[in-house]
């Protein structure tokens, strides 16, 4: 008995050590931004985005507190085989008060198993909700290839000249389909599951310092038995992507060409959309029709120009041509140079221009935006974070068209359509004006 009692403290210590080691193995990653800002004409900070554009130049032009908190852990490992559990909870508030209630979004919860298939060394099996191989332009917060959501897949299969990845994910639309009631009355209240099937071939070395990635995505509306879509709904579509990445000037340049059809055009990033119906009456549900095509040509990157200068840049042309004439032509160009006074202090400027032409009206909206920021960051790279910055932003815009969301679809035949700025004596778009804002912001990723 005495021997047992003497061994007990040692056993407890060993158990505590094991539990401590396991606790220390938890990975904590994430992203956050928050700050305070004012508008020159009075009131809180207002942000500037061109009507019809899918993004905006973000430096000194973000008006919310946003965070993603990721917890993950390698829960099992034997040799080169392992299982990893990953989670991500995100939230966004308007940064107007101390207490701002919000419903967090559970954006990731997945398990990734590496090297589980003997004859596919280096590959990963995964299932669950996941940010899946996302491609974006940081300076405009624009995701041009992103099929994230609940799904499953097999990735990084070594095929000799590259890595092959296969995945299936889902994005549902509210009110996407109906069941038959009586007297030809349909009640569009059932969600429609939109499935996306993704095939990618990446890391193909085609020139010194250059790699090529090719991808095909097929999206479709997956209806339940005895349900139907509204007439004209976009049932399926394709997205084709080619991306060349070149190492240059201690950074990279990415050149991207994408072509999409029908349900893959509205978001243009790989998620299927077009079966959703915002109104019970299918007579007024025309606005979900996105049959047509999209072409996107994009070049972006980040480079170092000597010891003291870094720069991000982007140039993009996007043409969404829809059968219902509600598409757009959008082109944007911008730069973000950074001058480093010390390894932790810099001055950053961002200059961006957007131009969006309405397919329906032929009119154009444009905006110039310039931001000057003094910044303190954890390192001497344009990617170094955390960063604390004080900024001043000036924007000038001239908008000739907007979307008509007055009333509702039952009493407005133009609901959701592009109209000229002065349509029917109204005021659509943001008109011709300018404004400036100033404030302070922190940004961090880890």
UniProtKB/Swiss-Prot annotation:
UniProt-listed Gene3D superfamilies: Porin, LamB type
Transmembrane residue ranges: 27-40, 65-75, 82-93, 105-115, 123-130, 157-159, 162-173, 192-204, 209-222, 235-248, 251-263, 291-305, 308-323, 327-341, 345-359, 363-376, 387-399, 431-445
NCBIfam families xrefs: PRK09360.1
A GO BP annotation: polysaccharide transport
Induction context: By maltose.
Protein name: Maltoporin
One Pfam family from the record: LamB
Outcome following mutation: residue 219 to D: In lamB1002; decreased affinity for maltose, loss of phage lambda binding
UniProt GO molecular function: carbohydrate transmembrane transporter activity; maltodextrin transmembrane transporter activity; maltose transmembrane transporter activity; maltose transporting porin activity; porin activity; virus receptor activity
Disulfide cross-links: 47-63
UniProt note: phenotype after gene disruption: Resistance to phage lambda. No growth on dextrins.
Membrane topology: Multi-pass membrane protein
Topological domains, Extracellular: 41-64, 94-104, 131-156, 174-191, 223-234, 264-290, 324-326, 360-362, 400-430
Similarity comment: family membership: Belongs to the porin LamB (TC 1.B.3) family.
Keywords from the UniProt entry: Cell outer membrane, Disulfide bond, Host cell receptor for virus entry, Host-virus interaction, Ion transport, Membrane, Porin, Receptor, Signal, Sugar transport, Transmembrane, Transmembrane beta strand, Transport
InterPro entries named among the record's database cross-references: G_neg_Bact_CarbUptk_Porin, Maltoporin, Porin_LamB, Porin_LamB_sf
UniProt site positions, description: Greasy slide, important in sugar transport: 31, 66, 99, 252, 383, 445
Site description Important in sugar transport, residues in chain: 143
Biological role stated in the UniProt entry: Involved in the transport of maltose and maltodextrins. Indispensable for translocation of maltodextrins (alpha 1-4 linked polyglucosyls) containing more than three glucosyl moieties. A hydrophobic path ('greasy slide') of aromatic residues serves to guide and select the sugars for transport through the channel. Also acts as a receptor for several bacteriophages including lambda. Binds maltosaccharides; when LamB binds starch in soft agar, it inhibits motility.
Periplasmic topological domain residue ranges: 26, 76-81, 116-122, 160-161, 205-208, 249-250, 306-307, 342-344, 377-386, 446
């Amino acid at each position: 008995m005495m021997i047992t009692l003497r061994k007990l403290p040692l056993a407890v210590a060993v158990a505590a050590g094991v539990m401590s080691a396991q606790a220390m193995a938890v990975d904590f990653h994430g992203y956050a931004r928050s700050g305070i800002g004012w508008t020159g004409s009075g009131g809180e900070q207002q942000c500037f985005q061109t009507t019809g554009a899918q993004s905006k130049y973000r430096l000194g032009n973000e008006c919310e507190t946003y965070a993603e908190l990721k917890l993950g852990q390698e829960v099992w490992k034997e040799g080169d085989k392992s299982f990893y559990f990953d989670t991500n909870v995100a939230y966004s508030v308007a940064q107007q008060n101390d207490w701002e209630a919000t419903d967090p979004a559970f954006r990731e919860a997945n398990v990734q198993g590496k090297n589980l298939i003997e004859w596919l060394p280096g590959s990963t099996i995964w299932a669950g909700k996941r940010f899946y191989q996302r491609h974006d332009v940081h300076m405009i917060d624009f995701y041009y290839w992103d099929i994230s959501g609940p799904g499953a897949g097999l990735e990084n299969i070594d095929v000799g000249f590259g890595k092959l990845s296969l995945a299936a994910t889902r994005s549902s639309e509210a009110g996407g389909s109906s069941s038959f009631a009586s007297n030809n009355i349909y009640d569009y209240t059932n969600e429609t599951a939109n499935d996306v099937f993704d095939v990618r071939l990446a890391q193909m070395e085609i020139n010194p310092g250059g790699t090529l990635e090719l991808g095909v995505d097929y999206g479709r509306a997956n209806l339940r038995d005895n349900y139907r879509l509204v007439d004209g709904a976009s049932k399926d579509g394709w997205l084709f992507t080619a991306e060349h990445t070149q190492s240059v000037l201690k950074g990279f340049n990415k050149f991207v060409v994408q072509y999409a059809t029908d349900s893959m055009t509205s978001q243009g990033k790989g998620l299927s959309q077009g079966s959703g119906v915002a109104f019970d009456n299918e007579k007024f549900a025309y606005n979900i029709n996105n049959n047509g095509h999209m072409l996107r040509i994009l070049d972006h990157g980040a480079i170092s120009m000597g010891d003291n200068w870094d720069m991000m840049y982007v140039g993009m042309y996007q043409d969404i041509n829809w059968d219902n004439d509600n598409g757009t032509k959008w082109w944007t160009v911008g730069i973000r140079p950074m001058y480093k006074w010390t390894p932790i202090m810099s001055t950053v400027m961002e200059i961006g221009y957007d131009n969006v032409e309405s397919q329906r009206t032929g009119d154009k909206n444009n905006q110039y935006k310039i931001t000057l920021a003094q910044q303190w960051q954890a390192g001497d790279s344009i990617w170094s974070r955390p960063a604390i910055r004080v900024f001043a932003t000036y924007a000038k815009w001239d908008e000739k068209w907007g979307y008509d969301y007055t009333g509702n679809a039952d009493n407005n035949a133009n609901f959701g359509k592009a109209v000229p700025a002065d349509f029917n004596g109204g005021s659509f778009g943001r008109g011709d004006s300018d404004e400036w804002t100033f404030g302070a912001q922190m940004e961090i990723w880890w």
